[in-house]
Regions:
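Active-site-adjacent bridging/hinge elements
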Residues: 16-30, 53
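C-terminal catalytic subdomain
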Residues: 54-176
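C-terminal amphipathic alpha-helical interaction region
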Residues: 150-152, 156-235
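Conserved phosphate/anionic-ligand binding catalytic regions in large, soluble enzymes, centered on
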Residues: 39-54
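Single conserved hydrophobic/aromatic residue that forms the stacking wall/gate
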Residues: 1-14
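Short, solvent-exposed coil/turn linker segments
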Residues: 31, 61-65, 94, 188, ...
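Glycine-centered flexibility sites
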Residues: 9-11, 45, 58
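Short, hydrophobic/aliphatic alpha-helical segments
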Residues: 24-42
Length: 235
């Protein structure tokens, strides 16, 4: 209850007396789905969006990456322009404060996380945290630049085994199928869009996404993460 998060939504299933958690800022509700959507779409998805690009750029801790203004702006743009339109504010939540607090936490060394942990098991995380937002954005003909960058970075991470500083790493993806491994090893980056975590949406049929994704793949191969990121987030 001492959590500084601006939103603490709890399902009101208590039938007997309970502590006065409202005094600490908790908000009770009969339906927590809106709070869950907010957490998955903003907090968890932002962790995923950060993971592979930051790791490839050479960062190993979340706070270090987010103190790089390029990554901080990338995440804020994702929250505001990509996920934000699909996240109605639950209850009395101040979404602007929520997003601001998330970025402050990500940059807090005292509670930082290892980026390698965020990279672990993208096959399970991406369908839950990222694909719902990407699917809606494709449907609405939104700007897909940041999501294309993320998917391209995921491919680069799985395929190459070295970050942009030349350091080798081991990929920890326990649920990759044999078909997934063939798609990763293939030369055509569009084939990668058939990977199992993307199967909720036919990404290869989304021409706008494919075009932006191809451009990101080429940029990562030629110039590296930070160069592509800088061009993407500059005003």
């Amino acid at each position: 209850i001492r959590d500084r998060s601006p939103s603490r939504g709890l399902g009101d299933v208590y039938k007997r007396q309970r502590p006065d958690w409202e005094a600490a800022g908790a908000e009770f509700t009969d339906d927590v789905s809106a709070y869950e959507n907010m957490k998955l779409s903003l907090l968890n998805a932002s962790h995923s969006l950060l993971s592979y690009p930051a790791f490839l750029a050479g960062y190993r801790r979340v706070d270090e990456a987010v103190r790089d203004e390029r990554f901080a702006r990338y995440l804020r743009l994702f929250m505001d322009r990509d996920a934000g339109p699909y996240v109605p504010a639950p209850g009395n939540t101040d979404l602007e404060l929520y997003k601001k607090t998330l970025l402050e936490r990500f940059g807090n060394k005292a509670v930082s996380d290892q980026i390698s942990r965020l990279c672990f098991d993208g096959v399970s995380k991406i369908p839950v945290y990222v694909m719902p937002v990407l699917t809606k954005m494709i449907r609405d003909d939104a700007d897909l630049e940041r999501l294309a960058f993320f998917i391209a970075a995921y491919r680069h991470y799985l395929k190459h085994g070295k970050d942009d500083r030349g350091r080798a790493y081991e990929v920890n993806e326990p649920w990759l199928t044999e078909e997934d491994r063939k798609l990763i090893a293939g030369d055509d980056p569009v084939d990668f869009l058939g990977l199992s975590p993307f199967r909720s949406t036919d990404l290869k049929a989304a021409d706008k996404f494919v075009s932006q994704y191809r451009s990101m793949v080429e940029g990562l191969e030629k110039d590296g993460v930070l160069s592509v990121l800088e061009k993407m987030v500059l005003p």
